[in-house]
Amino acid sequence: MGIKSNLLASAYYNFFGATGKDSAGSNIAGPFSASGGNIDGITPGNGYAYHVFTSPGNFTVPSDPGEAEVEGLIIGGGGGGGRQHAGGGGAGSVVHFKLPASAPILGTNAVTVGGGGNAAPWPGAADQPGTPGSDGNNTTITFPGSTPYNITANGGGGGQANNGPHPTGGGSGGGAYNSGGPEVTATAPTTSPSPAAITDAGGKSYQNPSCPGGNPTSPGSPAGGGGGGAGGVGQKAGNPGQPNANPTVQVGGNGGAGQPFPGFAGPLFPTMPTDWQAATGPTGIFAGGAGAGGHGTGPVTPNGGLGGGVKTEPGASTGAGGGGAGGGYASPEPTSTSGNAGLDNTGGGGGGGASNDTGASDGGDGVVIIRYLV
C-alpha cells in the first residue's frame, strides 16, 4: 500500500461527472424517502438520514427522488491473518461516493456486504509452511436502470503464513511473513460507469499495500509485517528496544492506519455496538490494517503488532478503524496472546498469529452506509 492519498476524506470524488443540475445545489426538490438497512433511516440531528447495511439487503427509493443527492460509504471485508509469526490481514477497500441527481436510484437497489476473510488454517505442526489467510469478500451496491451504476469495494488481502506462498493481494494487501517477502500490492476496485481513471491514490477509493516481513535493521528473529489499511501502509516488524529486553524477541509490524470520514462518525449511530462506535470514533475511521504476529520468547508481552496503525495501549484487541492486533508469544506461555479479529462492519484486517502457533484471526465484515439530506 505504498501509494497514499493526501486528499481529505471529505474531498470525495464525484466519479460520475457533472449532471448539468449542479447550480441547483443539494437541496431536495420535494419530499424524498427511502428504506432499507439494518438501521433504517436514522436521523441523528445533523441534517441527514442514514441507512446502515451490515448484511445484504435492498436500498429502496419508492418515488421520484427529484434533486436528492445520495452519498455513501462502501467497505469490503478485511483479510484474514496469517499463522505463526506471520503477516496481518489487509483492510477492505473503502469507496466514498456521491451520486448526482441523474443517477438511476429510483426503485430497488441491491446491496451485498462482504464477509471478512478466514484466518490461515493450522498447518499441522509448529513452524511448518502454511497457507495465507483468506481474502475478504467484496461489498457492492447496484443502481439498476438503462445505464446501471455498479459500485464495488474489494475485500482485503490475507496475511502470509509462515514459509507459505505469497498472498495475492486484495483491497489493501495482507502482511508478509517473517522472512521478508515483498510487500503485497493494493488493488483498486472497478466501477461502472467509470469515466475517470481509478487509482490507488484515493479520492474515490482508498487502499494501501502491506509491509514486507522482517526488518534487517532489527536484531533477533524476524516477525511478520502489518497489513495495509485504507489510510496507510502496514509497518515493518521491530525489536521492542525496552531495557533488559531479550534481543531474540521481535514485535510484529503494526497494521496500516484506517481512513477517516467525519460524516460517518461512530457517535452518529447510537444503536451500533459500543466497540464499533469506539473503533470508528468521532472522526469516522474505517478499514484499519491488522497487526502481525510476534516472534521469539522472552519478557515482552505482548509482542504482536498493533491494529490500525495507531499507538494504542499494548494488548488492545483492535485499533482505530477496526484492524485486529497481532498475536504475541512470551515466556511463560500462559501470557501469550492470539491474533485478534478485525472488527465487524469496519472492514478491518484480522491479526496475524505469533510463534508456537498462538493463533490468527478472521478479518472484519464490510459495511454499506448511505446518507442523504432531509
Q: PLM features: residue spans?
A:
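Low-complexity, glycine/proline-biased repetitive segments and flexible coils/loops
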Residues: G2-V374
